[in-house]
Structures are given as C-alpha cells and as structure tokens.
Curated annotation (Swiss-Prot):
Protein name, entry field: Polyribonucleotide nucleotidyltransferase
Stretch list, region Disordered: 691-733
Iron is among the record's keywords: no
Localization (cell): Cytoplasm
Described function: Involved in mRNA degradation. Catalyzes the phosphorolysis of single-stranded polyribonucleotides processively in the 3'- to 5'-direction.
Length: 733
C-alpha cells in the first residue's frame, strides 16, 4: 500500500488524512492532522472469536508528553498510567463505536489512538474519534460505520463547531456529539443552565457537522478501503431455542414481572438454574457440551431481554409496575454523618448514594499536568461503586473507567452552580459512595452532592438534580422511560442522563445500543426529564431550602487580606523562611496568589487572627501624620532611633525630642523607653523621620528657646542604620 493523502477544511482548520505510510501491519491505520494536532490511530482484530459473553472492544487514547514539547515528570521520566482526561476521551470514542458492530460479534478489537503533536486550538480528541472510525472503516474489520464526532460551543447566542481554547473559556456550553450520517448515537455535555430548546438545537447543529465528516470518510473509504473479513458471529441453535422457549418462556415471563429487584433476580435465576440443570443432564456426554451450554445461557438471556421489551412496548408495563413516566419512591436526608464538612443521603427506589463534602485551603487543589499547560483544579467529584451495592462480590482497587466517567459527569453537573473563587475561596471535594444500585446511580450521586454542598454551607447558585431516561425501540414503535432501573438499562436501547436546575440543564450524557436516535425521541426524552427533574428538586428543597449560612464547625475557617504585590516577597521571606515561621507559630495554612490575595485557613479563629496580625505587621508601612507608640532602640548624638512596628524604625532628631533645647539625647530618652511619636516625613528611600515634641503642649512663645542648627543639616546625614540594615530604617526581607 502506498501513501495517500486526503485534504479538506473543517470548522475553519485544515483536516489532512494520511494512509498507507505508517502502522501498515495493523488491520487499518490512519494519521489525522487537524490544525497542528496529529493523531495516529491503529485498529486491529483477533483472528478468533473470544470465549466471553460480551464484545471485547478496547479503545485507548494515549497522550505523549513530547506532543506538547513537555518533559515528563516523576522518577522514571516517562509517561505512566493514562490521565483522567485521557481515560474520559477513550470512553468518549468507545461509546459511539461500540453500537456499530454486529450483534453476536465476539472477536477482540483494539483501537489505539496516539497523540503525536498537540495544538490546543485544534481538538486532538475529535481527531482521534475521526481516526478511530476511519481506521476501522478502511480495514477488513466488519465495522458498520463510519461515525464522527464534534465539539459544540455556545458564545454570544451562536453555536461554534470545534471551538478554540479562547472560545471555550467564554462558552456557555461544552458539548460533544457523535453519530452516523442518519442519527446521533452519543452525547456528552456540560452547560451553564441552558434550556432544553437550546440544547436540542446544539445537538442538531452538531449532527449537521458530523455529516460533513462522515462524507469525507466515505470518500477516503471508497479510495483505500479493504473488503470486510468473514467472521463467525455468535448464533444459537434454532431448534434448541424453539424447544426452550416453548417449555420455559411462561415461567420466565412470570419471574420478570416480580416487582422487587432482589426477589425478581432470585425468581429469574431459579428458572435459569432449572433449565441449565435439565440440559446439563441431557447433554452430559455430548461432544459439543460446552457449545450447547453456552447456547442455553444465551437463549435464556435473549428470552429475558425479549420479555422485558415486550412488556414495555406492548403492555406499557415496567418490571416494577411503574408507569413509563413515573419516578421510583424518593427520600433525602442531610447531616447523615457527624464531624464531616457536609453530607447528604439520597435514595431513589433501590438506588442510594451518600455524598460527603470536604473543604480545604486552595493550596490543596489538584495540580493537573498533561498536554495542556499545568493548572489547578479547584473542584473534584469522585464516584465509588463497591460491589456490595449490587449484592455481589468482585474486584476492589483503583477506580475503573466507569467510575471515573460517572464522577466526571457529576462534576460537570455541579460545577456550573458553584460560587466563584472570590465568593468562596476553598478547594471543594465531593465523594459519592454508592450504597445500593438498581440503575441511575450517577444521577443519585448528583442529587446527594447537592444535599452535601447545601448542608455544608457552600453558597451554590441553585440546587441540581439528575435523572436517567431510557428507550425501548421496535422500529417506528418506541417508548421513552423515566428513571430507568438496572434491568431497563441492561435490556434497553438508551441511557440518557439529564442533570440541571430549575433554570436549565447543566449536564447531559447519552449512550445507546442501536445505531442512532432521532430528534423526535430526543425532544420527548428532554421534556420528560425536565418534569422528573423538577419533582426531585421539590424534594431537595423541602429537605434543605437553601445553603446554610455558616460552615460546619469542623470545616476550616478562612480570612483573607489584600497586600501589595511588591510585599509578597516580604511575607514569604527568603526560601519561604518567613511564611514557614508564621505557619509554625500559629498552626494555620496560608495561600498567597500572584495578585496579593492572602488566604488564611484554620479551625481556630484566634490562630487566624494572630497570623493576620503578623502578616499585617510585615507589610505595614509608616504614614506621614500617623501617631505610633514606639520603643527607643538606639541612641546617637544627633537623635534617637525608635521602632514603630516590626522592622520599621524612625529617627527622632535631637531637635524633635522636646520644645526646649536639648543638648544631650539621653537627657530626654533612654534605650528601652516607650514613647509616642508622630511621623513627619518619609524620604524617597523610605527613611522615616518622626517627632516627639509635636505631640507635647507647645510652651508660650516667649519661653521658646532659639535653636541654631548647622546650615543644610539633615537629620539623616549621620545615620548609619541598624547593624544588618545600612540602607534604610525601613527594611524588607
């Protein structure tokens, strides 16, 4: 295969695709150059069908630090585990690709995206999604694409496709939409309380752009695409299927309609165990025993799948007896835990999430170092899904892709209503512990997070609630479901999560198992979700009407002071010596930003006050006409040096000690004396002159002695300064 290059212009940037030059041993590969971002995508497929009961698709998105001209950190100085952003991007690509493989396809497929060069204004994520679809489409892997995806922004009332970094910073919308040329099949979004109408329009605008990219892919596939390989699909024995359906379908139908989750699972499992036992005995000596028993398990799964869908589409009956637009029973509680900074427990049917709030100084914020310039992340929402939440045993360890994705969705939903840093200078962490799950646990974590924030006194702009919508589709006949449970998610065609306030949507996420959904279905799903969201908000507001006016007693208190930027070095000191001393002495935590905002944190208000006093003293400046209670620290023949405060001294010239003539300074003051002085002058070098006599009653004019000073004498002429501060009595570290 020889190198071929295809070019177009998309969203104002050149899009270049190269094939036939690199990674030629993969089933399909492409280099996508978008702006100055370059992504290599390679797609490969195993030769044989995998043995599991699912399609083993793996999508990776690898960020190479050299792509942004950055040197890796850490001891090994090389890339380690994927960043959170890389993990989320891999999920973003996986989700629209997965539905495009045939039912029963079980060969392992890997799609590896490597970012080779990075342009922050030309999304490598969208280039990787384009490259993933293209590499699969031009390969011999039986992929029913192509698909494509775009980012959509909303600035000044206009939609922008693949916005630049600058445009993203002011956009009210951060939307990724993917799909085929006929329909949308994946959505991921955060929004600043936008209406359903605006969100729907954004989705449709995005899909129009997707169609352009698909047309470009089809042109490339026509030129360099391979013929598709013949692969074995998982098929069950039709005679065996007919036999099992005839004998056991009525039993399974009854089991599926048991309303309570655990009882329903027990009933369906009992039927499956009965059937399995019968056929294990019947075919115990058969040479294809393993294949037959695999078919039995698959047939039983298909029977349960078909019955759940039939009940909903034909009888309009859900497994737990609810109406199609009915929410499960709701419950909300705040202050579930003592000592923590805030907590909320939210229950929807058999799905339950506990959210716990922790507030910290801004110095505790997460530092994110990826391809973008290093930045600090103020708000984190972490989601944990232990196996006991579904009554099972299983793996424990670091969070997987699903947990990272669900945490990020909650983070997007809630960060839109957080107060600004100026209003609330804290780092904020929410942890959602899923205690029970029967579907829609990510949305329960959002509701619990709202409760925890409000209980903890975080002044959010409005409460946020989330709901998961489902879809059962049979050709033109479809049913949109409100608040889907686990069974409906597993056997349904769509998981459409919508979170927001009463004013509008703050987050969207959609995954589907069919090839796409129409604008009509999206409109209906958004309308039903709004109704459900308002019902949940009613409960949240009844539980806690507004954020509490004060933080929890255990939360760190904060006080802020503003200092001049040129004084920052005084407070920090050489090598951090001064600020470390303040922290050690008072037990507080101190953050100073580049604009001179000093934030002091502690659970002890007295410690905060002491630290403020020390810092104020460090940056304090003497002012003309101000009076100070000072201490005499040095005596010279021309006057006395007094300490006004901290490291600021002033000279009281001998002529300013008293109204009467003074021949000897020590006749008026001694070292260690405390005196009141008034600042009368500060010269260009910051040297301070003060007077004692101006604060004393002036004697009658006739008694006033005549002073004869040398012509042109300045009180600082003979000033040599303190031991370590020769230049000026005003000193800085």
């Amino acid at each position: 295969m020889t190198k071929q290059v295809f070019k177009t212009v998309f969203a104002g940037r050149e899009l270049v695709v190269e094939t036939g030059q690199v990674a030629k041993q993969a089933n399909g590969s492409a280099v996508v150059r978008y702006g100055e971002s370059t992504v290599l995508t390679a797609a490969t497929m195993s030769k044989k069908m995998a043995t599991g009961d699912f399609f083993p698709l793996q999508v990776n998105y690898e960020e190479k630090m050299y792509a942004a001209g950055k040197y890796p950190g850490g001891f090994n100085k090389r890339e380690g585990r994927p960043s959170t952003d890389a993990t989320l991007t891999a999920r973003l690509i996986d989700r629209p690709i997965r539905p495009m493989f045939a039912e029963g396809f079980r060969n392992e497929v890997q799609v590896i995206n490597t970012v080779l060069s990075y342009d922050e204004d030309a999304s490598p994520q969208m280039a990787a999604m384009f490259g993933s679809s293209l590499a699969l489409s031009i390969s011999d892997i039986p992929f029913n694409g192509p698909i494509a995806g775009v980012q959509v922004g909303y600035v000044d009332g206009k939609f922008i496709i693949n916005p630049s970094k600058e445009q993203k910073e002011v956009s009210l919308l951060e939307l990724t939409v993917a799909g085929t040329k006929d329909a949308i099949n994946m959505v991921e979004s955060g929004a600043k309380e936008l209406s359903e109408d605006i969100m729907l329009e954004a989705l449709l605008k995005g899909h129009e752009a997707v169609k352009e990219l698909i047309a470009f892919q089809e042109e490339i596939v026509a030129a360099v695409g391979k013929g598709k390989a013949e692969v074995e699909l998982l098929h069950v024995d039709e005679e065996l299927q007919a036999e099992i359906v005839a004998a056991y379908n009525s039993d399974l139908q009854k089991a599926v309609q048991v309303e309570e989750k655990l009882a329903r699972e027990a009933a369906t499992q009992a039927v499956k165990d009965q059937v399995t036992a019968v056929y294990e005995e019947k075919y115990a000596d058969h040479e294809e025993f393993d294949r037959i028993m695999r078919d039995v398990a698959e047939i039983l799964e298909q029977m349960e799948h078909a019955e759940v869908r039939r009940l909903i589409t034909e009888d309009k009956v859900r497994p737990d007896g609810r109406k199609v637009d009915e929410i499960r029973p709701l419950d909300a509680e705040v202050d579930y835990l003592p000592r923590v900074h805030g907590s909320g427990l939210f229950t929807r049917g058999q799905t339950q999430a506990l959210s716990v709030l922790t507030l910290a100084p801004m110095g505790e914020t997460q530092i994110v170092d990826g391809l973008d310039p290093e930045y600090k992340k103020r708000f984190m929402h972490h989601y944990n899904f232990p196996q006991y939440s579904v009554g099972e045993t299983g793996r424990y360890g670091a969070p997987g892709r699903r947990e990272i994705g669900h945490g990020a969705l909650g983070e997007r939903a809630l960060e839109q209503v957080l107060p600004s840093l100026e209003e609330f200078p804290y780092a904020i962490r929410l942890v959602a512990e899923v205690l029970e799950s029967n579907g829609s646990s990510s949305q329960a974590s959002i509701c619990a997070g709202t409760l925890a924030l409000m209980a903890g006194g975080v002044p959010i702009k409005a409460p946020v609630a989330g709901i998961a919508m489902g879809l059962i589709s049979d050709g033109s006949n479809y049913t949109v479901l409100t608040d889907i449970q686990g069974l409906e998610d597993h056997f349904g065609d769509m998981d459409f999560k919508v979170a927001g306030t009463r004013e509008g949507i703050t987050a969207l996420q959609m995954d589907i198992k069919i090839e796409g959904i129409t604008a009509e279905i999206l409109t209906e799903a958004l309308a039903q979700a709004k109704k459900a969201r308002f019902e949940i908000l009613d409960l949240i507001e009844a539980t806690i009407p507004a954020p509490r006016p004060e933080l929890a007693p255990t939360a760190p208190k904060i006080d802020t002071i503003k200092i001049d930027v040129d004084k920052i070095k005084i407070v920090i000191g050489k090598g951090g010596e001064t600020i470390d001393k303040i922290i050690a002495e008072t037990g507080v935590k101190i953050d100073i930003d580049e604009e001179g905002n000093v934030s002091i944190y502690s659970s002890d208000q007295d410690a905060i006050n002491r630290a403020k006093e020390i810092i104020a003293g460090l940056v304090r400046e003497a002012k003309v006409d101000e009076v100070y209670h000072a201490k005499v620290v040095r005596i010279e023949k021309f006057g006395a040096f007094v300490n006004l405060f901290d490291k600021t001294d002033a000279l009281v010239h001998i002529s300013e000690l008293a109204w009467t003539r003074t021949n000897n300074v020590e006749d008026v003051v001694q070292i260690g004396d405390e005196v009141d002085v008034k600042v009368i002058k500060i010269d260009a070098k910051g040297r301070v002159d003060a007077s004692m006599k101006v604060l004393l009653p002036r004697p009658p004019k006739s008694d006033k002695p005549k002073h004869h000073h040398d012509k042109g004498h300045h009180p600082h002429k003979e000033y040599k300064g303190h031991k370590d501060h020769q230049e000026s009595p005003k000193t800085e570290e």
